[in-house]
């Protein structure tokens, strides 16, 4: 990431001349911190800060996540000794360490305070700091819809540029020049965009999933303060497409299994055999309990030896003479 063209350039040793003055200025620069953030006292419900040391603003690390009534230092390591947070104004004081160069981003939300995302790109923090402020607006649209982006405006807008950034690669959408009153729309966006130079609004028609990314608006080539839009295009669900195009399908009949005649006869015979044999085995096993022998009563008549009367059935009174 290269600093903007209009960023201040540090003085060289030849221009400083006096070594004592050079040493003094170096010590002062090392002890001077910078302050970034909203600088506005509001009631906020959440404050998040992230940092990326990459020039492409990738590989973000969370610096702090603050929620009321959280107390103490909300800054996470390894940033506890490098920054300090003012939660009332959402202001971050960044100390002049070489590791604090890069991209800083804050997102906050609160009462009468819609979600706000601001990015700060810091260069040369140990010498002559240069800060680029980028206001970020997040937008979500459905595939096929049109959406309008409202860029920054100023009293005199001589040059307006709109870019699309996908995977850190910028691509021009259009360029407007007031001096010739002409708008140049690049080939891939011709017929898809409508531009209003007076209000600096850009309307993109028929959003596609490939349109998801970052849109950047720059006025008068001012790279210190720009406005970015993070657009996410939600694709149409495939289930809805299938329901609209495919007619209702009929229920699939369950196939019937045809039985073989030989196998059926075999199973029937086996079942009859089992039903016949099992009761016979049960009856044979429990024959002593199922067939109780009749009681036998033996009587001896005095005076008539060797005569015994057996009564197999009937009551005992049959023995009376």
Swiss-Prot record:
UniProt superkingdom: Viruses
SUPFAM superfamilies: Immunoglobulin
InterPro entries found in the cross-reference section: Ig-like_dom_sf, Ig-like_fold
Protein name per the record: Uncharacterized protein ORF9
Organism: Fowl adenovirus A serotype 1 (strain CELO / Phelps)
């Amino acid at each position: 990431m290269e600093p903007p063209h209009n960023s201040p350039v540090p003085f060289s040793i030849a221009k400083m001349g006096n070594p004592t003055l050079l040493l003094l200025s170096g010590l002062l620069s090392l002890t001077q911190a910078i302050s970034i953030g909203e600088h506005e006292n509001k009631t906020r419900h959440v404050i998040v800060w992230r940092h990326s040391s990459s020039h492409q603003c990738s590989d973000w690390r969370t610096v702090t996540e603050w929620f009321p009534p959280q107390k103490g230092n909300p800054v996470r390591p390894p940033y506890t000794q490098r920054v300090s947070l003012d939660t009332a104004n959402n202001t971050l004081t960044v100390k002049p360490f070489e590791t604090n160069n890069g991209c800083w981003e804050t997102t906050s939300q609160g009462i009468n305070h819609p979600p706000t995302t601001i990015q700060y790109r810091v260069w040369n923090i140990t010498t002559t700091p240069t800060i680029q402020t980028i206001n970020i607006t997040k937008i979500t649209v459905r595939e096929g819809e049109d959406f309008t982006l409202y860029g920054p405006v100023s009293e005199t807008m001589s040059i307006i540029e709109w870019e699309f950034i996908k995977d850190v690669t910028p691509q021009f959408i259009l360029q407007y020049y007031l001096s010739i009153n002409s708008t140049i729309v690049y080939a891939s966006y011709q017929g898809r965009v409508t531009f209003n130079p007076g209000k600096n609004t850009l309307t993109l028609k028929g959003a596609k999933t490939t349109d998801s990314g970052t849109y950047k608006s720059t006025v008068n080539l001012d790279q210190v303060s720009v406005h970015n839009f993070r657009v996410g295009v939600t694709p149409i669900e495939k289930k809805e497409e299938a329901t609209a195009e495919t007619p209702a399908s009929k229920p699939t009949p369950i196939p019937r299994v045809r039985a073989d005649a030989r196998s059926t006869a075999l199973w029937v015979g086996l079942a009859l055999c089992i039903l016949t044999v099992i009761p016979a085995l049960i009856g044979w096993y429990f024959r002593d309990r199922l067939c109780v022998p009749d009681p036998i009563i033996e009587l001896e008549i005095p005076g008539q030896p060797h005569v015994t009367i057996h009564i197999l059935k009937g009551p005992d009174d049959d023995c009376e003479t």
